[in-house]
Regions:
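Aromatic-rich carbohydrate-binding modules that target alpha-glucans
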Residues: 9-59, 69-91
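N-terminal edge beta-strand
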Residues: 1-9
Length: 91
């Protein structure tokens, strides 16, 4: 799931997944962090989910995927679209 908050100069985007599916650490990897694994690792929240928040520029499109333990890449089903290999997010 993706939670968004529009800001005056951009968007605050929170990527949310269940706390234990998939198991192990998960990070969101995309063009906004130069596709660097571990740059934005999802952390547990008190509501039984895990999440990470990033700030992105307004009126932009970003490609991203999730990376879990064991080199398991997967997409966000609630993204704004897909470009074949990646999920897309519009701010």
């Amino acid at each position: 799931m993706i939670e968004r908050k529009q800001l005056k100069d951009g968007a605050q985007v929170t990527f949310v997944l269940p706390a234990d599916v998939p198991p192990g650490p998960v990070s969101v990897v995309g063009d906004f962090n130069q596709w660097k694994p571990g740059a934005h690792t999802l952390e547990p929240r008190s509501d039984g989910t895990r999440a990470v928040t990033v700030r992105l520029p307004a009126k932009s499109v970003h490609a991203f995927r999730y990376l879990a333990a064991g080199d398991y890449w997967f997409d966000e089903h609630h993204a704004d679209g897909h470009d074949g290999a990646n999920s897309l997010l519009h701010t």
